[in-house]
Amino acid sequence: MTNSIDGPKGWQARAAAWELAALSFRYPGAELAGAVASGEWAEAAREIAGALGLALPKGWADDVRDVELHALRAEATRLFVGAPEAACSPYEGVWRAKAEGVQPLLFVNPHSMAVERFCKSCGLGRPEGTNEPLDAVWTELELLEYLALRAAADAMDAAAENDLAAGGDGAPTEEQAEQYKEIGDEIDEFDTEDDGPEPGDVVASADLPGGSPEAAWDEFMADHAKVWMPQFAEACEADSRVPFYKQAASLLAAFIK
């Protein structure tokens, strides 16, 4: 995303964008199927896009609601798992290997390993109970969500400090306090879901890559997400036989610009 939105609300909108995108590409469950069928998914996408200053085409996602969970799962399997290979691999290492003209290998390729090191430097590890590469599109999107939440929290702290410096009391309004709690609760969820080296501990902002959540977010976007996700989104939109995945891919493409 290259829009100029900043501040706590801007970072919260970015976090919401990545959260929705990650949910869209993970193996579908009842939560996703229900949100798609009810129209909640498309409504959330439009709201988030609007908050980020992005315009979705008229009639976007009008055709996604008439789909059942079994159809989503069948298409997700065909696209992202496949036999003998996925129609549209969800792994950065595979896309980067193809671009470099080398044999793609899961886990043991330089790009997958770089993503794993980056996650660890942010205090995050492989989601508990899983053994999948950390360069899966949904995992990378969740990392970006986490960094955006951290940036939102830091922006609120900075606003309070600026208020104090200007002679105010630094106390948040009721709305700001509720916003801060919401951000904190979402950050805490990451500590309970991964098996990082220090479960329950959050890496200090100054110790994140680049010295801040914003810098870490920019670095991961430049070195990883923007390098391969546009091509992944384009392929997914072209290859999918189910309208939902076509629209999810077009949404990811809009978010990643």
State where each predicted segment sits:
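Surface/interface-facing alpha-helical segments and adjacent flexible terminal/loop regions used
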Residues: M1-K257
